[in-house]
Amino acid sequence: MKDYNDNIHRPNPHNLYNNISLLCPPKMKGNSENLSTNNNPNLTGKNIKVSNRHDKMKDIHIHKLPDVENISSDMNPKSSKMFSFKNINHNKEENEIHLKDKYSFEKREDDMYNMSVSNMHKVPIHKQNIYSKNNYNTSVCLQQNKKETNNISYINNIHNTMCITNNKNDHSVEHKINIYNNKYNYNNTFLCNKKLCTQKIIQYIGKNQNTKHPLHSLYHTNVVGMNKFNSSNNLSDQINILNNNIQHINSTFNNLRQNNIYKNNDSIELFINNNLKSGDTNKYATFYKNVKISEKNNMYKQKEDKKQINNKNPYIFTCQKYFMRPSNVLHNIQNCGIHKKKKKKKKNHQIKHRSFHNIYKQINIINDQIDLINNKINKNSKDQNRAHILEISPLSLPSYIEYKNKNNNIFSSYFAHPNNKTHNFKKIKMIKKNISNPFNKEEPCGEKKNSPQVNDSKSFRYFDHSTCNNNYHNKEYMKKEQKSHLHSNHNINHEKGSDPSYNLNTKNTKNVTNTNDQTCIYEDHTFEKAVENNKVMYLKNKPIQSKLLKLNNQILNNTDQKKYEKCIDHGDTCNNKDEKNIKCTYKIDDILCSYNNGNNIKYEREVIKITNKYRNALEKWRYKFVHKNKTTKRNITSSNQKGKCNFNIFKINKHINKKKNKKIKKIESNKYGNMYNFVDKKVNNNQGNKKKNEKKNEKKNDKINDTINDKINHKINHKKNDKINHKKNDKINHKKNDKINHKKNDKINNKINHKKNMIPNQKPINNMIKYNIKNKKKIYNDTNDHADNRNIHSHIHKKVPNKKDNNINHMYYDNNNNINQPISYIHTAYDNVCHQINNDDHCIPLSCVIKNRKTRRSRKNKNLFNNKKNYTNEP
């Protein structure tokens, strides 16, 4: 960048022309590798090798824009395909810029998370054949008048404090290092001039920006002209500032990615406008009325406006007033945005997400800079007096150069065309999409149950430059018409009336020879590969068809396609009996399909197989376990009549002990948290608990019988002694009393002894577990001490399937009829699938995948899978 800095220090405007990334290819030799001035008019459709700054060769492919043909029709046919200026000199050779100069292409370190402008800024070495000052006073640098620049106080010392450079002694680099280390709060990281880093300007911008809530649009409040933030008004300077600005976002994203990864399943999406034309918007757009600017600036109405924005479209964060359709996804950056939590956790929540608010501010400043550049080019093409620019042909501005791997490049820049409003700088948009909730098959991806809908259809909001209106993209039109309008990577038939701006010329891109090269020139400003699964997103209540897998090999390759076509639900045409019963409809969203792997389909199929295989058995098994105490009913006989003793104390005490046992069960279930672990322990402890309960019941019965006998004998003896002492002479009455008392004692003792001598075989059979007499004989004859071991006699507690229950899979029962078999099998099968897919990462246990988040009191609402059809999350 040394040569670039030398040119900026010079005040001559014609030297500033070299700083703009114009791509004006001259005539070439027939077989020359480097660009030269020799004649070769047929440039389009051929590979041009341009020498890099590091003497590395890279291939560039050039396509001619459609606007060039229309405007350059007056020129000669030989030179119609050349990039040259119009109406300047009659000699055509002098009108050509020579590309002996080197071009700088920066490589990205991190393909997924690095945000970098595709730097095509020309570093001039040979300064020959520059046009005369009379014809090009300011060239394309778009300087303002001297009156406007003199009013700014600090602009006089521009050439002494050029902070756009990458020198180590520069103030902007020091500021950048402090930001990377997170030493202090960085509200204004993109202010490259030293004097702009003062406290006054930071306070001024801080007042206009709403730092608490990212939903407040910063476009209208931060109306300060961007020329105040820059040291000069040149396009080349401002574009270099964008380079530095985006590098700051790289550091913040990478720092946040290291800290906040693998916590939630939230994703940040960057929405970039695809520049829809006004004629195409009326077909399927429903206009959205913005909130007024005065209401946004009013402090009393801010809360109402935020609620309105949340209710209208909860997926979009209004970083700015433009909302575009999705063209790229930034993966695995978590916790961006606001989650609905309880009021008690608000303080921790604000501290947690504070670092992301600064990124929203930074992106808004970048968008304001892009607005300034686009407005200048559009205004200066009309108002010539403002910038003192002569008529500029569209041939003077470059074609659109972008990276080949568009999924890895988040911010791709290109120069705006002066005669075409739709081609402008792309804006970075951050949109938070919450997918942490479990997936529901009935709804399309990204759509919530309680989300408000416009005309009963989900809508994307986009921006049109020509009309400056916020519009909604209607989903019903997407169903009826071609769904490939959503993205430009789909091949569209132009005969059906589709918009040609969405189409990418795949025929011309096949000529690129070097696949490892990251630079390629396209006819369009669109992406080569964007999010692949947008058609799947709109398939509602339908399984995936095999045709979608064949589209451009976006989800699966040709080799892997035959393997995974078995995973698709073909309905009655399927040959396998197992696959007819197991209807596999898959969860597919932006994150899964963008990896271009079939492992996600493997994972989804295996987990759904497990859940469908044992769901019916587990539901019945758990239902009987929860409701098994309902079999014994409370029967209280009314025996409190006069002259009779109440001998139902045993039943009342038994009922009281039941309530105590229920409280103990609730405490134990709260300890373990998960119902499955509690059920496992409960089933394994059945035998040991039964032995203990028998011993406890014997002790309780002995105590109760002793107390009853003592009371009765005391009363009888007391009566006997009274009668004997008072009526010694009445022998007849004495004999009668003996007979009566003898009968009473016999009845009482018979009842008590009958309850003592009850055999456990005579207990009522429970719905959950049935007893076998053969196994019980083995238990009583067993001499080994296995009373404390809980899992040894698990073969006793057999679960015999009912004859009526035909729906139960008999695979559920092992040869030993062990109840623990299904849960252990699910765990092992789940772990095997996880380890095959994720070799390095840790697996989520099954207790986290399948569980009840809410504990419900009423028994009617207790369902095994919480009323949701799909129970898996991405590990």
From Swiss-Prot:
This is Uncharacterized protein PF3D7_1409500. The lineage of its organism: Eukaryota, Sar, Alveolata, Apicomplexa, Aconoidasida. Residues 31-44 have a biased composition (Low complexity). Residues 29-48, 481-510, 680-705 are annotated as: Disordered. Residues 695-705 have a biased composition (Basic and acidic residues). Possible candidate for an effective malaria vaccine as determined by epitope response in sera. Keywords: Merozoite.
